[in-house]
UniProtKB/Swiss-Prot annotation:
Keywords: Cytoplasm, DNA-binding, Repeat, Transcription, Transcription regulation. Signal peptide: none annotated. It comes from Pseudoalteromonas atlantica (strain T6c / ATCC BAA-1087). Residues 5-52, 81-124 form the SpoVT-AbrB domain. This is Transcriptional regulator MraZ.
Length: 152
């Protein structure tokens, strides 16, 4: 399980260095094989261990290519999906199209989301968090049934 927000830097080749605390788990669970794709709702990337991504691919394969909404989701997620392996230094290459989608510069955030990571540009992440906190504090939204039963 991945949790926490980690401020890290992209190197000049566009590689993200996975923090040490996650590396052994990724090596044990998937031999460092990762898949990165875009988030279709946010200006960030989604980085999955290969077995987690394969479950998503299975779900995507069940969508209808005749339904334009389902086809669009397949096109975006699969079209941007890039498989790679962490190198011995724990680095993973983010391709130029992926970096462009998320507006990634040198400073980025790697954010654990249980079974995957989100990758954000540092300044975009800060703006998103401020917006999310403000929305939660306003409570000007309707709680879903699941959230009504959720407590911390």
């Amino acid at each position: 399980m991945f949790r926490g927000a980690n401020a890290i830097n992209l190197d000049v080749k566009g590689r993200v260095t996975i923090p040490t605390k996650y590396r052994q788990s990724l090596l044990d669970d998937c031999q460092g094989q990762l898949v990165c794709t875009i988030d279709t709702q946010q200006p960030c990337l989604l980085l999955y261990p290969l077995p987690e991504w394969e479950e998503i691919e299975l779900k995507l394969s069940r969508l209808s290519s005749m339904n334009p909404h389902e086809r669009r989701l397949q096109r975006l997620l699969l079209g941007y999906a890039t498989e790679g392996e962490m190198d011995k230094s724990g680095r993973f290459l983010l391709t130029a199209p992926l970096r462009e989608h998320a507006h990634l510069d040198k400073q980025i955030m790697l954010v654990g989301q249980l079974n995957k990571f989100e990758i954000w540009d540092h300044s975009v992440w800060q703006q998103q968090i401020q917006q999310d906190v403000a929305t939660e504090q306003e409570a000007a939204f309707e709680l879903t049934e699941r959230l009504q039963d959720f407590s911390l």
